[in-house]
């Protein structure tokens, strides 16, 4: 096990993604390095009021603690209470144009240790897409890129982690999906350290190709106040999910994490409406009927 190699990879991944987004947007990220009193620190990179992105945050963190909160692992309750290290890169990009989808990506590593015992470690991560106005071409491209990232490790991983993603990014109180999914994995160590780390790298390295071609296709589509209004309404679902269900948010708050970094995923403008329903047959209604339904995009588009 080599946490230093993971640390170096994650820092490099953050830098590569920041540079790629700056090329598309034309505006620079603010870099905010921070330290955590209990141990560790990180760098939060934030782009606000950009040309393409209204708010884009990508954070690297490496935090250390003496007692692991239970929220850190559903599958490894025996790790609770051990000393621990957690490191990861997490991003959420909220575009200005409603025809460009919001995206989330995260890759992370946990290790929990106790003197005289074997360390308990695992990787987690994934990426998922949240369109406001859906395009089948974009959904297929995103899912195909996710599949290709994990295929070298076994054909079973894409369908397994697509289902994990669909199940995880689901708002139970709304009975609806947050978006069109992607892949999601957690508590992952079944390939041994080196191959599990390679799996994580493959997912992280796939992000730019999964998302930026979609941004380039959609960022110049004309839109009106109607589309912006629906975008703000749907962003409300993003806020609800992150504050109620998201394990990273809950873990960060339980472990006395840095609030500004934990909440960098929040959209800048959000609206709620009482019992609103889209007009039948409208492009807004099509999002619900045709896109956020857990479709098997790659079986449909072989």
From Swiss-Prot:
How does it associate, per the subunit comment? Homodimer.
Entries under Gene3D superfamilies matching the protein: Coproporphyrinogen III oxidase, aerobic
| NCBIfam families linked to this entry | PRK05330.1
Binding positions (a divalent metal cation): 94, 104, 143, 173
> Record-annotated residues binding substrate?
90, 106-108
Q: Name one GO biological process term.
A: protoporphyrinogen IX biosynthetic process
Physiological role:
Involved in the heme biosynthesis. Catalyzes the aerobic oxidative decarboxylation of propionate groups of rings A and B of coproporphyrinogen-III to yield the vinyl groups in protoporphyrinogen-IX.
Catalysed reaction(s)?
Answer: coproporphyrinogen III + O2 + 2 H(+) = protoporphyrinogen IX + 2 CO2 + 2 H2O
The record ties this protein, via HAMAP family, to: Coprogen_oxidas
Q: Where is this site: Important for dimerization?
A: 173
Q: Which residues form the active site?
A: 104
Pfam families, sorted: Coprogen_oxidas (PF01218)
Q: What class of enzyme is it?
A: oxidoreductase
Q: Which domain of life is it from?
A: Bacteria
Q: Residue ranges of region Important for dimerization?
A: 238-273
Q: Which GO terms describe its cellular component?
A: cytoplasm
Where is it chiefly localized? cytoplasm
Enzyme Commission (EC) number: 1.3.3.3
Whether Magnesium counts among this entry's keywords is no
Query: Which cofactors, if any, are listed as required?
Result: a divalent metal cation
Q: Which GO terms describe its molecular function?
A: coproporphyrinogen oxidase activity; metal ion binding; protein homodimerization activity
This protein is called Oxygen-dependent coproporphyrinogen-III oxidase
Q: In which pathway does it act?
A: Porphyrin-containing compound metabolism; protoporphyrin-IX biosynthesis; protoporphyrinogen-IX from coproporphyrinogen-III (O2 route): step 1/1
């Amino acid at each position: 096990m080599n946490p230093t190699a993971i640390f170096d990879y994650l820092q490099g991944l953050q830098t590569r993604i920041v540079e790629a987004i700056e090329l598309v947007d034309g505006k620079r990220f603010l870099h905010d390095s921070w330290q955590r009193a209990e141990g560790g620190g990180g760098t939060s990179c934030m782009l606000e009021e950009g040309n393409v992105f209204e708010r884009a945050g990508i954070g690297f963190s490496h935090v250390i603690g003496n007692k692991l909160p239970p929220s850190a692992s559903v599958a490894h309750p025996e790790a609770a209470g051990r000393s621990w290290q957690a490191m990861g890169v997490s991003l959420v990009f909220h575009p200005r144009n409603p025809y460009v989808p919001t995206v989330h990506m995260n890759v992370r590593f946990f290790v929990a240790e106790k003197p005289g015992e074997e360390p308990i470690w695992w990787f987690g991560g994934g990426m998922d897409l949240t369109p406001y106005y859906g395009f089948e071409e974009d959904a297929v491209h995103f899912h195909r890129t996710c599949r290709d990232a994990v295929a070298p490790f076994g054909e079973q991983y894409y369908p397994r982690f697509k289902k994990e993603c669909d199940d995880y990014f689901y708002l139970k109180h709304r009975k609806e999906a947050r978006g069109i999914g992607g892949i999601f994995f957690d508590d992952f160590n079944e390939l041994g350290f080196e191959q599990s780390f390679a799996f994580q790298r493959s997912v992280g390295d796939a992000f730019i190709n999964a998302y930026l071609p979609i941004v380039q296709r959609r960022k110049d589509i004309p839109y009106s106040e109607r589309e912006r209004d629906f975008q703000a309404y749907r962003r409300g679902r993003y806020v609800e999910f992150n504050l109620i269900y998201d394990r990273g948010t809950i873990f960060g708050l339980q472990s006395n994490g840095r609030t500004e970094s934990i909440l960098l995923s929040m959209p800048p403008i959000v609206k709620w409406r009482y019992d609103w329903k889209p007009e039948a047959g409208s492009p807004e209604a099509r999002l619900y009927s045709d896109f956020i339904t857990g479709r098997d995009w790659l079986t449909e588009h072989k």
